[in-house]
């Protein structure tokens, strides 16, 4: 995760979640977003910008190169340069919606639901249960 702003609470929260629950996820803050996008594209990466002003996801999803995909989600007024730099401006819907909702739906569609069966290597693991919350440490047996 590249964060243009400086927000130590977000950085520490993300790092804590990865440590406890696992996954291949990292975060850097105070980055120059334009520099990072240009660098990504120079390295032959694809940039998908999630925006309600873009092309609808079903119309572009098969064109996305998901091997080297940078997903950009604007958290504030998005500069016009971002629309021009992105290889794809993608809309989950052309109606107002939250950024996290757009990212969640986009990632689910790109991964074709396979992320739902992923098992991460963190210290903790969730065990699905109908009646209660069950979280166990990896060293404990799972029943």
Residue ranges and their predicted role:
Residues 1-7:
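Short internal beta-strands
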Residues 6, 52, 94:
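Flexible loop residues that form catalytic
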Residues 11-78, 115:
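S-adenosyl-L-methionine/SAH cofactor-binding core of RNA-modifying enzymes
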Residues 16, 41, 105, 109-113, ...:
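Short amphipathic alpha-helical patches
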Residues 29, 49, 90-92, 128:
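Structural signal for conserved beta-strand scaffold positions within catalytic alpha/beta enzyme cores
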Residues 56-58, 79-82, 98-100, 127-128, ...:
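Short, well-ordered, mixed-charge alpha-helical segments that flank or form enzyme active sites
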Residues 83-121:
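Structured adenosyl-cofactor binding patch, chiefly the S-adenosyl-L-methionine
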Residues 113-143:
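Internal, active-site/partner-interface "lid" segment
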């Amino acid at each position: 995760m590249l964060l243009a702003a400086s927000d130590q609470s977000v950085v520490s929260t993300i790092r804590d979640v990865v440590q406890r629950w696992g996954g291949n996820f990292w975060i850097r803050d105070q980055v120059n977003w334009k520099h990072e996008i240009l660098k990504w594209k120079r390295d032959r990466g694809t940039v998908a910008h999630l925006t309600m002003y873009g092309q609808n996801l079903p119309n572009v999803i098969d064109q996305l190169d998901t091997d080297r995909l940078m997903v950009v989600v604007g958290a504030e007024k998005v500069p016009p340069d971002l629309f021009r730099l992105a290889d794809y401006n993608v809309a989950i819907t052309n109606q107002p919606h939250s950024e996290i909702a757009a990212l969640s739906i986009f990632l689910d569609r790109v991964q074709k639901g396979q992320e739902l069966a992923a098992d991460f290597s963190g210290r903790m693991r969730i065990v699905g249960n109908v009646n209660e919350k069950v979280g166990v440490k990896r060293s404990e047996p799972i029943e």
